Amino acid sequence: MGNTVAMILAGGQGTRLGVLTERVAKPAIPFGGKYRLIDFTLSNCVNSGIYRVGVLTQYRPHVLSKHIGIGRPWDLDRKDGGVEILPPYVGRHESDWYKGTANAVYQNLEFLEENDAELVLILSGDHVYAMNYNDLIDYHLLKEADGTIACMEVPIEEASRFGIMITNVDGKIVDFEEKPAKPRSNLASLGIYVFNYEFLKKVLIEDENDPNSSHDFGKDVIPRILRENLGSLYAFRFDGYWRDVGTLRSYWEANLELVLPVPPFNLYDPNWRFFTHTEEMPPAYVAPGSKVSTSLVSEGAEVYGNVFNSVIFQGVKIGRGTVVKNSVIMTRAEIGENCYLENVIIAESVKIGNNVRMGVGEDAENKLDPKVYSGLLTVVGMNSVIPDDMVIGKNCVIGIGVGPEDFKSKTLESGDYVIPREE
């Protein structure tokens, strides 16, 4: 079977990332100094020789759609094939919103027909990993499967966060449960599937006509295939690097893994490059007397202070006498002089004044949303302005577009938060 079409699910809201995803879809979140999350899935496609790609957008699609454009950075600006943005649409039977992952693909069966799909690769646009999809496809064809799911073993205490499967000795999936409270296995789905098109079309039409379905692959379609013995599903075990950066802690950790002496995720492999759409900027500048250690510093950055174990994105400016430790500083953020920042995530275009201390003090639970803002990280939303001489504790959150007038005093205790005042 030949023609493979990739469908990238890129409509996720990413609520566990808090202020980072209030204005952008999760796949558009910046990562690794210059990329956005979707770049890794798109690059995996073209590195695997897959040039027919649909990107299914939904929540806050503007930044993502602008980033992808016509696909030129990924060599996807093609007359035959290429990349196409596929938002929800109003049709005879469709709503104007994807009802679930399965419904999103169902609404675009016509796109698959137009591209003469024989195999359909269904991918998530918000994970960090490098995978040659041909290995998955070859395994799928070898097993003569109707569908194949990429998976990996995870610690059993984390298994309830994933779709969990049980297989026989031949790798055939015999049971699947989405995010079970008491997992019976630690073999977790990576949200990467390949299906024979005609089989997929049949089960999606049946699922769409099921009034009791939530139209989700993990919750509905896959369990039903197994329960009703509609076809054969196999598990493809992946042993490479894969991260779900769906929480602030996991996002921060995955970024800082990039600066390890031997990083588990290799951005520098000449045989498996990652492509992105990025602004042209001059080389990074590190001023005399500054110190940069165990960090990524991207083009356009100007460092006049000291940076340790951090990821510094494009166009960031760090003032004299400032120390940045264990932090992620996103594009065009500006940090003034004589500041101290530790264990912080600073979003795009934030301006921090002089003599600001952030990520210091006692540990405390966050008062805004302790389930989202945890792990003792302080997070600042895009376009915010932090005034001079502020002392901001651990586990704090500064909302999007916060200004100096929104701060009641020069001290923000650990666990506290500031959001913009309503007009």
Curated annotation (Swiss-Prot):
InterPro entries: ADP-Glc_PPase, ADP_Glu_pyroP_CS, GlgC_bac, GlmU/GlgC-like_hexapep, NTP_transferase_dom, Nucleotide-diphossugar_trans, Trimer_LpxA-like_sf
Residues bound to alpha-D-glucose 1-phosphate: Y98, G163, E178, K179, S189
Domain of life: Bacteria
Pfam families according to UniProt: Hexapep_GlmU (PF24894), NTP_transferase (PF00483)
GO biological process, one term: glycogen biosynthetic process
Keywords annotated in UniProt: ATP-binding, Carbohydrate metabolism, Glycogen biosynthesis, Glycogen metabolism, Nucleotide-binding, Nucleotidyltransferase, Transferase
GO molecular function: ATP binding; glucose-1-phosphate adenylyltransferase activity
Classification via PROSITE patterns: ADP_GLC_PYROPHOSPH_2
EC class (word): transferase
Known EC number: 2.7.7.27
Reaction catalyzed: alpha-D-glucose 1-phosphate + ATP + H(+) = ADP-alpha-D-glucose + diphosphate
Function recorded in the entry: Involved in the biosynthesis of ADP-glucose, a building block required for the elongation reactions to produce glycogen. Catalyzes the reaction between ATP and alpha-D-glucose 1-phosphate (G1P) to produce pyrophosphate and ADP-Glc.
Family statement drawn from the similarity comment of this UniProt entry: Belongs to the bacterial/plant glucose-1-phosphate adenylyltransferase family.
Name this protein carries in UniProt: Glucose-1-phosphate adenylyltransferase
Species in which this protein is naturally found: Thermotoga petrophila (strain ATCC BAA-488 / DSM 13995 / JCM 10881 / RKU-1)
Gene name in the database record: glgC
